[in-house]
A protein has these predicted regions:
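N-terminal beta-strand motif that seeds the catalytic metal site of vicinal oxygen chelate
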Residues: 1-9
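Ordered, amphipathic secondary-structure segments that act as subunit-interaction surfaces
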Residues: 61-83
Length: 162
């Protein structure tokens, strides 16, 4: 299964991922149209910065997702890809999922009073945020491939110290 992985050392805090996400989830699916939409489209990835370090955060689709357990109406479900998705027609706006998310990533869209969370852009081969990232801080790949690449990188660094 593919996961959205973060290489935080590469994030510049440019927020290209946020913009691409909002445009992808807009009605027009283009920047000019998205800017003029009302209400404005919401992004689902959040670039957080502190002390010069930046980190793009989005739903981690936790194995034991507290939001799924907290959802009173059954609006939150795990789809066939393993992604936690929201059926807005079932959502009653209790926002229990917002309160229990350990990452603070599920947010509320006003004035619709519905939740907004990353859905991994199901119509795309890779999420819009990944495609938009100019530094490769966000990658979408199989966990095994990512682990193998990290091990190779560690080996290369170790070779340089010997």
């Amino acid at each position: 299964m593919k996961e959205l992985l973060i290489r935080n050392e590469r994030c510049l805090g440019c927020r290209s991922c946020e913009l691409a996400c909002a445009v992808e989830h807009s009605q027009s699916r283009n920047l000019l149209g998205a800017i003029s939409e009302s209400p404005r489209p919401r992004y689902r990835v959040h670039v957080t910065s502190r002390g010069g370090d930046c980190l793009p955060l989005q739903c981690r689709n936790c194995e034991e997702a507290a939001c799924l357990d907290a959802c009173l109406s059954g609006a939150l479900q795990r789809d066939e890809r393993g992604i936690v998705v929201c059926d807005t027609a079932l959502c009653v706006g209790c926002f229990m999922c917002v309160m229990v998310c350990p990452f603070g990533i599920i947010t509320v869209a006003e004035p619709e009073r519905r939740i907004v969370k990353c859905d991994r852009c199901p119509e795309r081969a890779e999420p819009a945020c990944v495609s938009a990232c100019p530094t490769g801080a966000l990658i979408y790949q199989e966990i095994d491939t990512a682990a193998r690449e990290r091990r190779s990188a560690v080996l290369e660094r170790l070779k340089g110290t010997m």
